[in-house]
Amino acid sequence: MGLEEQLRLLPDRPGCYLFKDASGRIIYVGKARNLKNRVRQYFQSSRNLTAKVLAMVGQIVEIEHIVTDTETEALVLESNLIKKHKPKYNIRLRDDKHYPYLRLTLTEQWPRLVVARSMKKDGSRYFGPYTSSQAMWETMKLARRLFPLRTCNDPSRYPRGCLQYHIGRCLGPCLPDFDRHREYAEAVRDLQAFLEGRTQEVLERLRARMEQAAERLEFERAAELRDQIRAIEKVTEKQKIIAHTMVDLDVIAYARLYDEAGVQVFFVRQGKLVGRDQFLMSGADEMTGGEILAAFIQQHYSQTDFVPKEILVSEDLPDADVIAEWLSAKRGSRVALRCPKRGEKRALVEMVAQNAQEAMTERRQQRELELAATEGVLRELQAYLDLPRLPHRIECFDVSHVQGAEVVASMVVFEGGRPKKSDYRRFKMKVDQNNDFANMAEAVGRRFRRGLAERAAQVEGRVRDLEEGRVAEGGAEYGGKFADFPDLLIIDGGKGQLSYARAVMRELGVDHIPTFGLAKENELLCTEDRPDWIELPRGSQALFLLQRIRDEAHRFAITYHRKLHRRASTHSRLDDVPGIGPKRKKALLQHFGSLKAIREASVEEVAQVPGITLELAERVKEALGGPMR
């Protein structure tokens, strides 16, 4: 079906649209109040489209759409689809999956505060993400000092109380005669409020409890509460007052750097600045400031539980009313989303914007220093090895096995002196398991055969683009990771491995790529063009870079080899039976206890296991042997 026909079939309804290229990959996800009108705008006139959007439109061959009941639902769906598919042309939060959270385990009998690497829908309360692990651990340390919740995984292991209990940092739910259930529940509630920045609320509750304890003549308990109040007051005294009303709000501003945007968020709770975070957004080139902030708000607040009553932004947002409606639904009460133009709040926004600009300036300077240092190392390496061009892309191959078993090879890639892990590849050897030289040749051959095939696909894609009137740039999308050839190829090994690798490269017509062997024993390099070994100066940055690349290839190969070895060590004859997957295998072993018991059972007895038909039972018995009846 052609694009014109696909456009004609779009409904006049709210929803999300997904643009796909010729390979079926989703390259952009968007939302719309009216799908037909919004999507048609991309194809009606190119005058108002940026170069980036034009390039994207030139690659679209299929349009998929999902209808929703409201525009707010479309906004939520768009955020989820972007996170799932990571489309090339959408602006996205970078590396959010690496940011840690603090997790309050509310579903456990005795909740505790722990570190989590991702959010799950498990009934826990998550705080974060924390872009600084140091800030996260400082918050954890403070919370554990102020609120005496358990820190152990299994309270039953400490019937006499753990160390934290004996030093007054835990109420001791592990004790058999523990009777402070109410106090523990109050500590959990206070910790949650404290981490949300509602310290004044916590202090008011603690003061009320202290007075009640004193009235009941529980002076020891009153003293504990007094000390807790003083500790919290000491912490909050250090927090800067930036609003003269007891208000909870987030203040968000951004600054640009190349195709990135740095978004700065200041967290104000009850009028005091309790923290700030810096986030990076990729794909921000040609996006307006409002579009950057809107994308950030959607993605950031979809990952966090707490939404403040008010959010201030440095620029007006597109679809601000829809975003505010979504935030309000998430919070459970009205959220004000504002771009202040004057007054105290405008000054606050400008202060955050200034911080964002300073952070990105620092990032630019750091990047320039790193680039200058890296280019110097690469030029040094180019001179030592007499390379025709700067080795921007370096690939390294390593083979790993134990006595010829589970032979694997790895290919690691460094670009600009840094690992490019998205281009790493692993190969399970298929030919000669006991010949290191042949294994290296197989890995190198498979890499370049795939690369040549992808380059051919690129050419075909460009020709098809030109014939169909699409943007020629789109042809590049038909290739894969192997289509980029290295400026320098390193073989982990000596002249034998190098010779076999070069032979297969000549056969494929890629022997123009400079290739060197790097011996482990003495860190010497060899190449076909020189009879003698090449020794780089000890302590040189060029040698250090090659060692780092070689060690990374070895690590990557060893990791894969161990994975295969573990899989082989847990392999059973049941794994070879068609129709028996992990669940049915588990059911059989749980029912009979061992393979021997299954072998001795009859077909009818095996068929009594849930999920096992009579036909499957016969297959199992044929594979394992033993009596059929």
Curated annotation (Swiss-Prot):
Sequence ranges assigned to domain GIY-YIG in this UniProt record: 12-91
List locations, semicolon-separated: Cytoplasm
Record's GO cellular component terms? cytoplasm; excinuclease repair complex
CDD domains attached to this UniProt entry: GIY-YIG_UvrC_Cho
Name the PROSITE patterns for this protein. Answer: GIY_YIG, UVR, UVRC
Gene Ontology molecular functions: DNA binding; excinuclease ABC activity
**PANTHER family the UniProt entry points to:** UVRABC SYSTEM PROTEIN C, UVRC/OXIDOREDUCTASE
Q: What does this protein do?
A: The UvrABC repair system catalyzes the recognition and processing of DNA lesions. UvrC both incises the 5' and 3' sides of the lesion. The N-terminal half is responsible for the 3' incision and the C-terminal half is responsible for the 5' incision.
For this entry, the protein name equals UvrABC system protein C
